[in-house]
């Protein structure tokens, strides 16, 4: 099973525009699982499960728990994991990956659906959602026009349970993930920067998320860790809550693992050890015991800082795109990264800009 995982990662490297978009860095997945700490006998879902990375990490975490009884072991093998993957080849890779790691049965009913998770609420609710929905801002579908040529049409999902109707794929996944959770469910989701700052539907979704869930943590990720180039992403951690008038979120803790952090896929890839400080700050076993590492005078370089709900609501468009650390790369000319690292970072930033312009062009078209 581990050899197969290694081959999937190698394939992701070789096909950046192909399998790479379905492959989340395994150290990041492991850190997310360590923070969420899923419990035996609970269900775990991923509405865009790719090759099954989140399932495998959660399985390893749960299988390592001491004294699992026979029922819990059977539940872990056959009933814990539920996913969707619309790309047929990727779904097959996922099913094989899971079977090789002793999840499910070859002749059993698959818990990985080939259906588009966003089309409708199927009514099922889960204890945990761990996900990295596909990058690419717009949802679209291809069709053949009258002249026999192929066109794409912007796709919006008109769902009564969504707070906002939008063609932004990530905002739709975020709304869907919230709807998948049990009242006590927890989510950890990788999402691009636009989800944090986009106006219109983006602001509506952020406000509703702050009101109806406890959005307690945002991990800002560096560039250079994903196979899809130019991706600037974050992990949002939130707990679902029962309905009430007052907002459930009182403060959001932000860990900036982007400013002055340099990773590349080959020379300096992200390692699990790199996220140890974040996990320690997250304080998985008792979040109420968290302490800021940032201090205005004593430690202005601290990466861990909290913002009250009022501070966030007062920001333009309720933006969660928050930074406070100074970018040293411009000031510290003595300690610039290696030329090839610098070149790769420049390419990442240009790619990110180009991707934004492509989305604008699509919108104008």
Language-model features: where?
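Conserved phosphate/pyrophosphate-binding and hydrolysis machinery centered on Walker-type P-loop NTPases
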Residues: 1, 18-25, 167, 336
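Generic structural signal for individual residues within well-ordered alpha-helical segments
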Residues: 1, 29-30, 343
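Long recognition/docking surfaces used for binding and targeting
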Residues: 1-12
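General structural signal for alpha-helix termini and helix-helix connectors
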Residues: 13, 17, 330-331
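Conserved S-adenosyl-L-methionine
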Residues: 18-131, 135-149, 171, 191-194, ...
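A conserved structural/catalytic subdomain of Rossmann-like adenosyl-cofactor enzymes
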Residues: 120-365
């Amino acid at each position: 099973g581990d050899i197969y995982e290694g081959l999937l990662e190698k394939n992701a490297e070789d096909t950046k525009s192909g399998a790479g978009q379905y492959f989340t860095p395994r150290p990041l997945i492991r850190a997310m699982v360590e923070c969420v700490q899923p419990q035996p006998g609970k269900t775990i879902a991923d509405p865009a499960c790719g090759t099954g990375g989140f399932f495998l990490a959660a399985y390893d975490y749960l299988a390592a728990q001491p004294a699992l009884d026979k029922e819990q072991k059977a539940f872990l093998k056959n009933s814990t994991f539920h996913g969707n993957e619309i790309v047929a080849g990727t779904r097959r890779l996922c099913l094989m990956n899971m079977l090789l790691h002793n999840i499910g049965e070859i002749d059993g009913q698959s818990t990985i659906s080939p259906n588009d998770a966003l089309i409708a609420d199927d009514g099922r609710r889960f204890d945990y959602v761990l996900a990295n929905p596909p990058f690419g801002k717009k949802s679209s579908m291809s069709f053949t026009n009258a002249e026999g040529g192929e066109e794409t049409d912007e796709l919006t999902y008109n769902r009564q349970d969504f707070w906002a109707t939008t063609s932004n794929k990530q905002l739709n996944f975020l709304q869907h993930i919230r709807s998948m959770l049990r009242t006590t469910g927890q989510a950890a989701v990788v999402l691009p920067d636009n989800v944090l700052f986009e106006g219109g539907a983006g602001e509506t979704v952020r406000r509703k998320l702050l009101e109806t869930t406890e959005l307690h943590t945002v991990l800002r990720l560096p560039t250079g860790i994903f196979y899809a180039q130019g991706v600037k992403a974050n992990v949002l951690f939130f707990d679902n809550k029962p309905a009430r008038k007052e907002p459930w979120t009182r403060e959001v803790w932000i860990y900036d693992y982007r400013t002055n952090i340099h990773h590349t896929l080959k020379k300096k890839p992200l390692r699990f050890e790199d996220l140890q400080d974040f996990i320690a700050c997250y304080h998985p076993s008792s979040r109420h015991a968290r302490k800021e590492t940032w201090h205005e005078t004593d430690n202005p370089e601290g990466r861990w800082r909290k913002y009250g709900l009022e501070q966030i609501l007062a920001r333009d468009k309720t933006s969660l795109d928050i930074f406070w650390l100074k970018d040293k790369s411009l000031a510290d000319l003595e300690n610039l990264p290696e030329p090839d690292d610098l070149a790769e970072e420049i390419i990442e930033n240009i790619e990110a800009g180009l991707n934004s312009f492509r989305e604008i062009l699509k919108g104008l078209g």
